[in-house]
């Protein structure tokens, strides 16, 4: 007797077999091979090898009025409950069975195990003919000529893998045929199916080369197979010859896979089918491999399936991975689902009956639809688990697991009902019927028809409380057309359909693009390009960050920025953009374009200026305000702050690169500042004034486009007040000596520039704003202050240029008051055409306090720049400009 702790047991989700012979008689075709490979074997935990022979049982089930048979292997001693003596818990398979069967889905859960002895005994029965008999029903939609290519590919794969075994002991050829079957169930074209058959031939054998595949089946098949296998083979060679870690090699493989799928989407579709079958047979791998593969599937492949809209594959990958990664949590969730369903089974049945009756009695639907199906659907186990984690409560306390009813309508052709009745209008009509019966819960109606998800998903969602039998439970109702339902399940795969036209899936019959062999490929379809637009981001990142990002960083960027939870926002033109949850307006700016992010000075959300730290929420309208004339140093300082607010790795990498570029442009100035700071911090006794940096400040044309250059006069440059008592005059900035000071004539056009943390001291009798700000000139000219040395010098005015937004004057004055700056008066003018505002404050302050306050004014939301100034006495003819 084999001990419980050494048994290899798994839970199997067996798809109900409804495969036909292909002879038109709709006879069921079920064999040990066809059902066994299709069945996902999901481990409940603690696998170990066993020599105990399985006992085969035959079950009968009905679907759509037809009976079919399926064959599986079950352990007699453990019919319902599987326990492990060394394990801290028991897996309750009874609840798993109950939850799956009660949901009315298309799957049944059974105990399943395959031993090496039984599979090796069956290997002699595997021939090309038996494999073709099992594969043909799933690809019978292909034309005869294309079926010949598939059969040719099967023979080639059979020869290449002859004599090879899987870990389970079964012939290796079963795996590629199973992958081809999965692709056939998605009704993909023959190139994809042949690539599925050959995807391991180059990697695992020396019999097949890429050149041979191209010669036999064309460049498209070679490209797909190459994307599947070539990189993995190189990765294996690296492991043997180099000192790289397994994680680095795996990251490099994933990076190459991501890049390959940007050129050919079918690379990832075949890869998903390959991973799905590997997950279904993962029970034969060692426990540490199971955990690693399942974790990678949850992190990379399931989110990729979601991005492609392939929800059927995504759901199965998540649930299978969940059972391997956390068997205890899986058991608790399934038990909770079963208990909740038992509590509300009566109400759900009654709600279904009421809704069906309402639809049957509606005359409009009878006129415009062929038929309407109402299905009872269970939420996926893993999605419920994530919702429970989000609520930060125990799964046993989580009661908001909404049961689902899915309404799928099949409209009549538009010729029969007229152009005024579109499929979308029928869906909205059904939504109205649902709300006539039950009132919707506020903020639960989601219209994915008007605003589809980026992967093409379309449906109407609403959540109601039926109030039946004095019981309250949430009932989610989904409404979609037959075409929408097909796209929701298969996603991007419908655009590689094996038929000549994609009929009705995107509105009308759309002739698809053609590949090298003249087969339909949909590469020129606008909807297709829209649904895989996120692939462009991967390609752009590779081009932008080549040499600056390791493979592990690149893969981490993709998994976090693309494959995580998303939020959907709108551009001002109504385009939908999706970003990772928690992204800020800084991330949005760099998502639109790198140059937009580099030139960003402010952002508006729903028409209101917001802080760069603003976290985006669903359905917000985001607008980025850019400015082309920011100085290098000002841009450097702003983006250095924004680096802290960027949440996506891609935005952070772009900002880092921008900072390096800006640092190179103003390297001399930055180096000089760093030297001066170091000397000041070291309490040096050197009191000599340092020479100013060589930076050439840009003319701020957009703000002062009409300011006239001043007439140059023959003035001496050495008009700085002489130091008193023979002392060396060296003003302090922020308490530090030896800051760079520039003494320049007033004829230099450098009197108003964006704030960069350096005070600019200007004479008041220069009409700087005469052309653009006439109201300020006379006000300022009447204010004359006196320049004093070191501790006694005074500042006369402060000019702040900002975006025109409500409350900005109050915020700036609050900052000034908080720093103890005395305000004598203030005027402001607005340029509504450009959305700019200029504020001019008459103040009393010294250099130390002014430099400190200007640095804080620069951080006020919407401030683009500032400039400060003073004046010499009127008796002084040689007006000078001092910058410190």
UniProtKB/Swiss-Prot annotation:
One Pfam assignment: HD_4
ACT domain span: 797-868
Keywords assigned by UniProt, alphabetized: ATP-binding, Chloroplast, GTP-binding, Kinase, Nucleotide-binding, Plastid, Stress response, Transferase, Transit peptide
Region Disordered, annotated ranges: 711-747
InterPro entries for this protein: ACT-like_dom_sf, Beta-grasp_dom_sf, HD/PDEase_dom, HD_domain, NT_sf, RelA_SpoT, TGS, TGS-like
Domain of life of the source: Eukaryota
Similarity comment text for this entry: Belongs to the RelA/SpoT family.
Protein name (Swiss-Prot/TrEMBL): Putative GTP diphosphokinase RSH1, chloroplastic
Species of the source: Arabidopsis thaliana
